[in-house]
Amino acid sequence: MSTLRLLISDSYDPWFNLAVEECIFRQMPATQRVLFLWRNADTVVIGRAQNPWKECNTRRMEVDNVRLARRSSGGGAVFHDLGNTCFTFMAGKPEYDKTISTSIVLNALNALGVSAEASGRNDLVVKTVEGDRKVSGSAYRETKDRGFHHGTLLLNADLSRLANYLNPDKKKLAAKGITSVRSRVTNLTELLPGITHEQVCEAITKAFFAHYGERVEAEIISPDKTPDLPNFAETFARQSSWEWNFGQAPAFSHLLDERFSWGGVELHFDVEKGHITRAQVFTDSLNPAPLEAFAGRLQGCLYRADMLQQECEALLVDFPDQEKELRELSTWIAGAVR
């Protein structure tokens, strides 16, 4: 029996693909070597310890229907579209070695006619007349008895959109999480016009087989049929949940400020695991009572626009004369908090 396993996803859903990856990783035999090939439609993928409110323009993402997905590995935030090819190599220890998987990807690129090299802790770069340009970034995860290396290759990604979603609004957001390092990047189509996802997958597969001296049939993973993977439904539910993607953010503080016709408002939030642990309000309004009451209601509230709006609008019962101000506050919060 072969020790290799090759899986290819035909889903573009990041939550589906990351759930598949997680399930395979948890249940694979320690003697198995796995290659999983996949890609995502418009998604910002953040590292396990990152703060989406810090890393991403979450309001722009919502408007443009871009998903947020938190992976189980560390590292920084990246934007995925169908111009990216994603790969995951898994193996039990002591077989797991990220230098092996890196060399497989480099060999695949070389077979396609691209001379690339490893740079720093997790990048692959090509040399251009303008200097080194990143074509691949990776992240890693290890447990006691196994590990995985996953990453992306930029084929024909819309690089103009990177700045749309990976540059957060210029808000006063002080975070204790990891801030992603931006790198100068380029697409493989600049070097190989017309290169396709299928060609890259085939090259990586051939390099994978060549390294281990074995071949196996590919298993196609599709959302049209629930994957036969232990605990997949539960893993997918967690991967797609707000609690995982947003609520796992490290502790941070957020300051929102706005000036209305009736006065200026500053809202200070301390947030842990997606819940407000402290809220303060500062205002020069002639009637600060409803704002003070609003801040008092927020202890333990989910840091989500709809939940804050709900608490704000609940004050209409106690402060009917301040309906205009409270509705303006609620509308502002809807746009300021995502």
Swiss-Prot record:
Monomer. GO terms for cellular component: cytosol. The lineage of its organism: Bacteria, Pseudomonadati, Pseudomonadota, Gammaproteobacteria, Enterobacterales. Catalyzes both the ATP-dependent activation of exogenously supplied lipoate to lipoyl-AMP and the transfer of the activated lipoyl onto the lipoyl domains of lipoate-dependent enzymes. It holds the Pfam family LplA-B_cat. GO terms for biological process: protein modification process. Belongs to the LplA family. Keywords: ATP-binding, Cytoplasm, Ligase, Nucleotide-binding. It comes from the Bacteria. Gene3D superfamilies: Bira Bifunctional Protein, Domain 2, CO dehydrogenase flavoprotein, C-terminal domain. (R)-lipoate binds at residue 134. In the transfer reaction, the free carboxyl group of lipoic acid is attached via an amide linkage to the epsilon-amino group of a specific lysine residue of lipoyl domains of lipoate-dependent enzymes. ATP binds at residues 71, 76-79, 134. Pathway: Protein modification; protein lipoylation via exogenous pathway; protein N(6)-(lipoyl)lysine from lipoate: step 1/2; Protein modification; protein lipoylation via exogenous pathway; protein N(6)-(lipoyl)lysine from lipoate: step 2/2. GO terms for molecular function: ATP binding; lipoate-protein ligase activity; lipoyltransferase activity. It is found in: Cytoplasm. This is Lipoate-protein ligase A.
